[in-house]
Structure formats: C-alpha cells, structure tokens
C-alpha cells in the first residue's frame, strides 16, 4: 500500500528563484525604460517592495548596502528572508538581489551567500587596480550566472560611510571598464546620494551622452535617484540609463508616515502599540513611493 501524502505536491512545486539583473536590464535599455533598484533595510521594506512589484507586474532589484546587510544579521539571513518571501508571497516577477556599493571582500561574501547580483565599487581605486579587481569579479560572476555592476567616477554624498564628491566620470575609463564584460555601469554624472542641496548643478547630460557613445549597449546606472526632477530622470533614460537606484526617498516616506502615526497618538489607542500596526503606515508609504517610481521609470507591465 502506497501512502498518498497530500504535502508531496506542495513539496515538489517549483520555487521562483532570484535572477541575475542582466536580462531585465538589457530589455530595459532596448525598450527605453528603467528598472528600479530599491534598497531594503528589514522585513517590512522587503515585503512592501516585492508586493508593489508584483501588483504592477514590474521587474525589480532589491539593493542591500553592506551596512544594511550587517543590520539584518548578515547576507545569508537576507538571502533566506528574500527567497522565503518570494515563495510565500507568490512573487512571479523577476527579482534580483543586489549588493549596493560593495567592497571587493563584500562582493565575495554575497556571492557565497547566494545573492544574484553584486556591485563592485572600485571608483576610489586607481584605474589600474579597479580594472584588475573588476576583471577577476567578471570571471567569478559569469561562472555563477550573476550580474556585476561597476562604477567609474565617485557618486557624491555618503553611502554607509563611503563619501564621494559627485565627480563626472571619464568616458574613456568607462569604456575600459565596460569592455571587461561587466553587466552594467554606474558612471558619475554629478549625481549624489541622499538629499540634493539647493545649489546642486544638476546632472551632466553631456557626460552621460559621451559615456553612452563609448559603451554602446551597456545598461547604465543612475545612483542617487531621490530628488532628481522627473524631466531629468526621463532624459537620463533616453540616454541609456536602464537602472535607477532609490533609497533615501523610501526612508523619508517611511519616517514621515511613522511619525504621523505616533504624533496622532494612535499608538496609545487600543493595541496601537502593536508593531504590526505601528509600522503599517510606513509600509504603505514605501509602497506608494515605489509605485510612483516604477510608473516614472516606465517598468510597469514589463515583467
């Protein structure tokens, strides 16, 4: 007698896996839209972004800085959480899990942990050393089926303690790095992380156009997407940007919504102190921000 275990079908079901960002970004570049990278900081952030991507049928990249990775206990914890959510939320859109502004050592840790994409930020190295380290990572990522982002020209502002002045990249250096076989290239074009100051001069489209001419079909990446005017975003996409990073804007929206909940005294009403209730307005604020960005970037219904 063969026992028919009703759980067998569930156990055998295929689980949607993390994907490299390569295919989604090549499609975006060809289709003149951009895929958003939204950085995650905890369970609520991750759930909000994944659910919004699924609702809008949009590909998405979950970014994890080295600082956020440490905050969430480590890269293996992050991979487990994201894979579990993709499965149990029934996420079917393409999802890449990407190390943001990774050190050389950080890239290897994420490769080992199961990320599907990494960024090696070698912009602070001399170009020869940047080339050598990037060349090595290109080979490793290709063997693992992962995507690799490289950077030329330091992005301004501060990213987990890494400070950049907002340089404009040298198009010739961009070509040198692109020719190594990276998946995508972040070129500094006057953009910065965090809030843009009142005296910000704007994006250098002259630099972006020159980089595009030098790198051809290479998907370009725009860091510091928070606060850049919509017309600049659209022009950047028209000049080859296929990936746009958003972090600060989600943080500001989450903080404002959470502050509003507490200041209204809702945490003192009934069981309003329950963290699931206290954090809910912030989660909805993240969803609204991600939706707005996906619509602006043109990635809706592009999964």
What does each of the following model-derived ranges do?
Residues 40, 97-103, 219-230:
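Glycine-rich beta-to-alpha transition loops that act as phosphate-gripper elements at the mouths
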Residues 37-39, 59-63, 96-98:
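Short, conserved beta-strand segments within well-ordered enzyme catalytic domains
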Residues 229-303:
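C-terminal alpha-helical cap/extension of soluble enzyme domains
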Residues 14-36, 83:
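N-terminal amphipathic alpha-helix/helix-capping segment at the start of soluble metabolic enzymes
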Residues 68-70, 125-127, 250-255:
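Short gly/pro/ser/thr-enriched loop/turn and capping motifs at secondary-structure boundaries
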Residues 189, 224-226, 248:
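Active-site proximal loops enriched in glycine and acidic residues that flank catalytic Cys/His/Asp
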Residues 1-16:
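Short, Lys/Arg-enriched N-terminal segments with co-localized hydrophobic residues
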Residues 23-25, 43-67, 77-92, 104-214, ...:
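Alpha/beta enzyme core
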């Amino acid at each position: 007698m063969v026992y028919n275990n009703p759980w067998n079908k569930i156990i055998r079901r295929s689980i949607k896996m993390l994907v490299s960002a390569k295919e989604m970004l090549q499609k975006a570049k060809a289709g003149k839209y951009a895929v958003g990278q939204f950085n995650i900081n905890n369970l609520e952030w991750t759930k909000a972004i994944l659910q919004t991507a699924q609702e809008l049928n949009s590909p998405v990249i979950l970014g994890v800085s080295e600082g956020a990775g440490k905050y969430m206990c480590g890269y293996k914890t992050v991979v487990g959480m994201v894979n579990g959510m993709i499965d149990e939320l029934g996420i079917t859109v393409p999802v890449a899990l990407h190390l943001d502004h990774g050190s050389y050592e950080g890239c290897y840790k994420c490769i080992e942990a199961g990320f599907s994409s990494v960024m090696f930020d070698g912009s602070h190295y001399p170009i020869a050393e940047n080339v050598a380290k990037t060349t090595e990572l290109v080979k490793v990522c290709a063997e693992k089926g992962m995507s690799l982002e490289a950077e030329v020209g330091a992005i301004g502002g501060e990213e987990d303690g890494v400070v950049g002045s907002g340089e404009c990249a040298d198009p010739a250096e961009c070509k040198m790095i692109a020719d190594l076989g990276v998946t995508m290239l972040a070129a500094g074009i006057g953009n910065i992380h965090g809030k843009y100051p009142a005296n910000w001069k704007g994006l250098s489209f002259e630099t972006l156009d020159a980089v595009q001419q030098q790198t051809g079909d290479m998907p370009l990446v725009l860091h510091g997407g928070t606060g850049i005017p919509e017309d600049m975003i659209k022009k950047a996409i028209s000049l080859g940007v296929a990936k746009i990073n958003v972090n600060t804007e989600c943080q500001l929206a989450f903080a404002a919504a959470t502050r509003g909940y507490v200041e209204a005294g809702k945490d003192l009403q009934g069981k309003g102190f329950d963290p699931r209730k206290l954090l809910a307005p912030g989660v909805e604020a993240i969803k609204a921000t991600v939706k707005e960005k996906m619509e602006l970037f043109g990635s809706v219904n592009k999964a």
